[in-house]
Amino acid sequence: MKKTSLFFFLISLSFYQLKAQIVIDNNAPYDNPSWMVDNVLLGGGVTTSNHSYQGDSVQIGWFDATNTDLGINSGIVMCTGDIYELDPNVVPGFVGVQNTVTDPDLLTVANSVPGMIGQTFSVTSINNVAILEFDFIPTSDSLRFRYVFGSQEYFTYENTQYNDVFGFFLSGPGIAG
């Protein structure tokens, strides 16, 4: 009987798959958006200036997702709430960040959503915004940006006026596309 029980226990473990978990940090130096742009976001061959961050300090930090299914091993994380809510070891619950940050480009993106989902509403404001801006000059003729966008609210507010949006805006001479 013991051998049979042990056999079935070992067989059941063979179907168990271990997954790594994302690590979130916004302690120094990850609490400094300028440092993170220069040392985490951008690789070599880029000169940066005019760093600015708008939002609450709990909305930005660093993540390590090595050995997860996220698709990016590590980088900068920005969130509409507290970034620590993304950590699976934190008790779930949304902690919204109430700030007065707004951006006309993000509002335009938000207003493009209704037509894409077959709706006719108008978005009049954006909330819980985090904006990281900087100027950069690359030493080469191309630039690559990898990102993952996620929404905790997607299934709750699908096809409504409450949509999470993301924008990556480039401007300057010679920008095409």
Say what each PLM segment does:
Residues 21-177:
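Aromatic (Trp/Tyr/Phe) and Gly/Pro-enriched flexible surface segments
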